[in-house]
Structures are given as structure tokens and as C-alpha cells.
Amino acid sequence: LFAKMLRSPHPHARIKSIDLTQALKRPGVVAAMTGKDLPIPFGILPVSQDEESLCVDKVRMIGDPVAAVAAIDEETAESALEDIVVEYELLPSVLTIEDGLKSLEETEISKTQIHEYADSGNIHKQVALEFGDIETGFAEADHIREELYYYEGNTHLPIEQHSAVAQHGADGRITLWSSTQTPHYVHRALAKVLEMPASQIRVIATPVGGGFGGKTDPFQHEMVVCKLAMMTGRPVKLTLTREEVFYTHRGRHPVLMWVKAGMKSDGSITALHFRNFLDGGAYGSYGVASTYYTGALQTVTYPIANYKFEAMRVFTNKAPCGPKRGHGTPQPRFALEVLLDKFAEDLELDPAELRLRHLIPDNSKTVNHLTVTTNGLGECIHKVTEASRFQQRRTGSSLGKGFGLGCGSYLSGAGLPVYWNKMPHSGVQIKIDRGGGVTVFCGSTDIGQGSNS
């Protein structure tokens, strides 16, 4: 069977009623369901169990699914969606970071609050960490700059859409084949949502193709196909359309950034202070981790003795954001690199030279306790500037625009100093048999990087 999901045309609304009667009468339709058939919420992180397989009482974004059907073919399933009658009560929408930051007093919170479990109003997560003495660092600076930056979000856009097939066996076990980067998380979510022992569920991660972080959450369509397979006793497949992939999203957060930095006349950074405001969209996803990542990894390229970052992630009535290549770091890195260029102008230094003078050395520990074993950024800058004739082209342009230098970085194995907690962050089990065979059990799903080999 083939499944399709009916999605909300409204960004924020209460669901007053859903009528499946006519859809079930359509020839070729085998089953239909609403959120009341799978009311238990789920999520990728324990602190953000805020997603429903199908929305139960409220939709929080355009594209939120409210009902699903299974039919003999995709065309019949698609047509049956038109037979479903949904009555909504529209609610005010929160569409910007600024609106998400408004206090309880400034809004009719009973109507605009997207999730009741939020820290305050529509603030999902707040973070504040300081390393060193930020005020002392600014006092030591010869130059201080204070800037405001905004990074537009973007999406992963893998060629291969999300797809899942579920089968309910005669023994009562569920098998799910899904284009997922995180089968263990999907397995855990299914056990919770279906109220089944995990031992009765098997999740098989099929060759994913493109993922880029966009297939690292457990998703609604995976829960829905499993329930429909249980309802019908037949295998059920659901493939998202390209439009639905955009609704699913989990792309890079839009971030509003205030940054203040102090620098000595030789170009060394004495203090760096970030305030980041993330537009998280309608659901938690990896948002708590994303909030930490927008601040924690800005110290691994240049030595910074005093560092402070504060961050807030707000809920808005838009597609949920999550992890995308370089999770959480391109946004503040963009701000920092532009800021360094402005400092280079102040000091009348070449932008490349400013960076080369102050690279974090190998085998060092950053102010926020990240360990940098090797840093090849200097060699990279040399090669790029030479191959591109950076100095000649930058100074030779009559407009002085359209040609610049920016550096990015990411650190592997940085879980603990980014998100401080007592939970285990990774593990591996190795088994060696008597014949010399070695079996490795690890939590890394192979999506092309070679984990299986």
C-alpha cells in the first residue's frame, strides 16, 4: 500500500475536528488515521519530546500533518486527502525572532505560545557561558568593535527525498526500512510512540544518498507507515514529495548575532562576546545542541583568552530547524570572519596576514576546554592566497568588492565541552574471536563515510 499525509494550510491553529468518513469510502482506500491513533509525542532529544506523528490538538506550522491514508496506489491516496474535512480555529502566528523573544506581558500568551514547555513564552533554550574574564579582556584591547549580523537559514536539499516502508509480520514484529542517518534514534522513538517493546521493532537504514544532517531526526512519516502497516496487515510505503521535504526541513537556523570583540594593535584578540538568537521553527529537534554549537566552536582557529557567549533559541510558526553540515558553526563564523576583516582595515593589515599571525597552535587547549591536536589552517591560507593571487586581486580591483577571504572550522570529538552533562557521548564495542576475526559494533550509520567497512 501507499500512504499520503494531509498537511495544514495554516501556520498556527487549533484542530476542532477531523472527518475521515468520505476518504474511507473512496474505492482503493484501505485505511485512514489521525493523531488520536498515535498520540504519544517523540523527539530526537530527551528534553524536546514535542513532535506528534500527526497533530492531535494543534498545528504549529504550514505543512504540519493532521491525517494520513493508505491506498492501493499513490494517486488514490493523494485523491483521498481531498475527501478529509478538517475544521480549524486560527491562532496568531509568531514568524520572527523578535516576536519569539516577546515577553508574556507583550503577547496574548494563551494564543501565541507554540509549546507550553518552553522556558518562557516562546523561548525554547537559553545558554550563558563565560571563560576567562571578558571585562579584563576588553580593558586590555587597543581596538573594540561591536556589530550586529543576521544569517539567513537554508536547507539541505538532498536529491533523494525521505522515504520509508513498514511491514507488520505475522509474529507481531514491525520492520521499518527508512532513508535515515540515525536508525537507533528512530528505533527508540518507534518503541515509545507505538508502545511496543524495542525487541519487537527492527529499523533498517537503507542507502541514504544525500543526508547532510537533514535525515538525522526520527520523522512523522516513519511513525505513520508503521501504524498503517499494523492497521492493514500489509506493507506500507510513504515517500515525501519535494514540497514535503521542505516542510520536514531541519535546515540551518537563521541567527541574529550581536558580537563585540577587543583586539590589540598587533591583531591578537583579547576578548570576544557573542549573543546569538536562533529561529528554531516550530519544534525542538536538535535545537538545544544547536544553541550550544553556535557559541562553543568559535575558539578553535584563533587564540582567544577571554570568551563569553549567550544564546536563545525561540520557537516560531515555521518549518523546524536542526543540524546541517557544520552544525551550528557557519552562522557565527560568518559574523566573526567579517568582523576580522573590519579589524584588518582598522589596523591597515592584509586580512590574510592578520589571520596568519594569530593561529591557534597544534596540541593546544582552548579557553573553553576544547583540544586542538592539529590545525592546518595556516597552510590552507597560504595555498589559497597564492593560487588565487589574493593580494594582487584584492588591491587591484577598482571597486574593492567581490573578492574576500573567510575561514571556517569544525572540531570532531567535541561533545562534552560543547554540551556539559554526565551522559555518555559515544561508545564502541570490539569483539575478537578465536580465529582472529574482528567485529566492531558502533553507533555510526554508514552514509558513505565507510563505517560498515
Report each predicted region and the residues it spans.
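Glycine-rich loop/linker segments at domain edges
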Residues: S120-A164, P254-V338, P417-H425
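Glycine-rich and small/hydrophobic secondary-structure elements
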Residues: S48-A77, G213-S265, G322-D346, V367-F390, ...
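Alpha-helical support elements that line or immediately flank enzyme active sites
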Residues: M5-M33, A67-Y88, S163-V208, F212-T232, ...
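Helix-loop-helix junctions that connect adjacent transmembrane helices in secondary transporters/permeases
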Residues: T107-L194, L359-G437
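Acidic, glycine-rich active-site loops and adjacent beta-strand->loop/helix elements
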Residues: L38, T180-P183, P207-G211, L240-R250, ...
